[in-house]
């Protein structure tokens, strides 16, 4: 089983994502894990009622790990009352679509509760 660790301290977020422009009035968090000797992390922000999936950092492409990172971030947002998730990370479009994100005008989006159910549960 893969364990995903939540990071909310700004100093640790800055170490995980050096050079990322963190805004003062936005709440950031990340999930990170190690799998098969490779490091993976997902940075996201909560801005009002929207969760923005900002950046995924990985040593290699591992769809099951990416899926776990995305689900962890969605769960974090959902538990804090956030209804909508958005993402512009086209490199991970297969994983986003498999979760149930829809694409419009260059952005993937969806309702956090529905996304946590996954596309296999939708009719």
Placement of each model-derived feature along the sequence:
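Intrinsically disordered, low-complexity segments enriched in polar/charged residues with Gly/Pro
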Residues: 16-20, 30, 81
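Acyl-donor binding region in acyl/amide transferases
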Residues: 51-106
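Short amphipathic alpha-helix that is part of the acyltransferase structural core
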Residues: 1-25, 119-123
